[in-house]
UniProtKB/Swiss-Prot annotation:
E.C. numbers: 4.98.1.1
Protein residues bound to Fe cation: 210, 291
Lineage top rank: taxon: Bacteria
GO terms (BP aspect): heme biosynthetic process
Subcellular location: Cytoplasm
Species, as recorded: Idiomarina loihiensis (strain ATCC BAA-735 / DSM 15497 / L2-TR)
Pathway: Porphyrin-containing compound metabolism; protoheme biosynthesis; protoheme from protoporphyrin-IX: step 1/1
GO cellular component terms listed in the entry, alphabetical order: cytoplasm
Biological role: Catalyzes the ferrous insertion into protoporphyrin IX.
Record protein name field: Ferrochelatase
Presence of the UniProt keyword Lyase in the record: yes
Length: 364
């Protein structure tokens, strides 16, 4: 096997610290053609769908990829903007803002970039770009506040797979979760309070998280517990009583039982229980995306209003708001402790260039 080297490296050059923020991914366009390879990559991940591989291969390629790309493309069209996919540009904005924040302390010694677990920008390509810039210490932050094997661990799998192809590996640190990180809770609470200041409160506040199969919880995945802890900490910070908020789970897929209560079923039931107004916030989504803008902002609105509800409001994700960037930057700084880089003088760089030149074979 031929391992990938670092041809741009020169002895004595400045080592840099890299911060790689990642998210799930997005198709290249809201079209059936673009959705098929994206969904195939996503749904082929054994961390996402824990089903015997041969059986799932037949289901995925024989059924799902024949019909789902068209339906998904129609949904993506409703959230697509001039800048493209919301998840893509929000993550890009977050990375840019984090970089600006960190450079106040680290200057040019730090490199910040972003990648997607599925689709583009591909994780392996971004890691290579960062290595070529001199990154020798790499901190990875998957933007999933609550850990799950289907998201956070999958990101680590992809990173580890990339490392198997490299000759020179960077020092690595990997943030697995931040569901109870106080600055994150504060940023989320302030986002909700900002909405309340503009629109007032509803009868009920729902914290809706992406669901996972119940089987994953029973097999030891801590995601369910971390979601409930985030909800509890937010409720305490906001001064909410137990009857003023709910934790629900959305986006279930297939016939298997997932974490409950389901967001959509809750929306259909609440008006019959006397709840006429609701506000929904999604603490597990660092950026607005299809699941928040379309599924929560539109689809679940219809369920609630058609069931007798009178007022429904989606509270947007934290995206690149300053409080969120401050929280993520502090989280990163906490995890960079103990790492340092050495500034390279002009004289040292000239010496390094000379050494590199002497080490290269002579031209004929």
């Amino acid at each position: 096997m031929k391992y990938q080297g670092s041809p741009g490296f020169s002895h004595g050059q400045a080592d840099k610290i890299g911060v790689l923020v990642t998210n799930l991914g997005t198709p290249e366009a809201p079209t059936k053609k673009a959705l098929k390879p994206y969904l195939k990559e996503f749904l082929s991940d054994p961390r996402v769908v824990e089903v015997p591989r041969l059986l799932w291969f037949l289901i995925l390629n024989g059924v799902i990829l024949r019909f789902r790309p068209k339906r998904s493309a129609e949904a993506y069209k409703t959230v697509w903007t001039d800048r493209g996919s919301p998840l893509l540009f929000h993550t890009q904005d977050q990375a840019s803002a984090i970089e600006a924040k960190l450079k106040q302390t680290w200057g040019d010694n730090i490199v910040v970039d972003f990648a997607m677990r599925y689709g583009n920008p591909a994780l392996s390509e971004v890691v290579e770009k960062m290595m070529q810039k001199g990154v020798r210490k790499l901190l990875v932050l998957p933007l999933y506040p609550q850990y799950s094997a289907s998201t956070t661990a999958s990101t680590f799998d992809a990173l580890a797979k990339d490392f198997t192809k490299r000759r020179w590996l960077p020092e690595l640190r990997f943030i697995t979760h931040y569901h109870d990180f106080s600055p994150f809770i504060e940023a989320a609470a302030q986002r909700i309070e900002k909405h309340w200041d503009a629109h007032g409160r509803a009868d009920k506040l729902l914290f809706s998280y992406h669901g996972i199969p119940l089987r994953y919880l029973k097999n030891g995945d801590p995601y369910h517990c971390e979601c409930y802890k985030t909800s509890r900490l937010l409720a305490e910070r906001l001064g909410l009583g137990k009857d003023e908020y709910l934790t629900t789970f959305q986006s279930r897929f297939g016939r298997e039982e997932w974490l409950q209560p389901y967001t959509d079923m809750t929306m259909k039931a609440l008006p019959g229980k006397g709840v006429k107004s609701v506000q929904v916030f999604c603490p597990g989504f660092s950026s607005d995306c299809l699941e928040t803008v379309e599924e929560i902002g539109e689809e679940n609105r219809e369920y609630f209003m058609e069931s007798g509800g009178e007022r429904y409001e989606y509270i947007s994700a934290l995206n690149a708001e300053s409080g969120h960037i401050d929280a993520l930057s502090q989280l990163i700084e906490n995890n960079l402790q103990g790492w340092s880089v050495e500034d390279v003088t002009e004289q040292r760089q000239q010496r390094a260039d000379q050494v590199k030149k002497q080490s290269l074979p002579y031209d004929d």
